[in-house]
Amino acid sequence: GTENILGAIGFGKAAEVVIQNSGENTKVKNLRDLFETKLSQHFPRVNILSQNVSRLGNTSAIVMPGVLAETQVMGFDLDGICLSAGAACSSGKVKRSHVVEAMNIGDEPATNTIRVSFGWDSTEPEIDFLIDTWLKIYERANKKI
């Protein structure tokens, strides 16, 4: 068949960009780690999934005890923060995370996990705002009426 020359050129350019920006990946991982450290300091009960294993440098999966993922996503959205629940391959669907279910760590993580992704332009003040919002959502959801 015909060789995909344009595809090969595009792939080569993409590889160049990845190499040129490899330092950005370290920066993003450091921001993710800073977020997880600060969140753990403010809320020791937080469950950060797969925190101590090799994983994507830009993503955190966090269980908010007692608060459904859908409730969290709506709360963050109201404050202008975009994040998601469930696996990346099922974005936009409101259902239990099949990825977290496969980890076999219980029902609450499968229903209460949010996924936070950081990018090259993410900043420490944005992380602080995210943590403040996280705590506000948790407190509001657990407020005794």
Whereabouts are the PLM-identified features?
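Pyridoxal 5′-phosphate
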Residues: 1-145
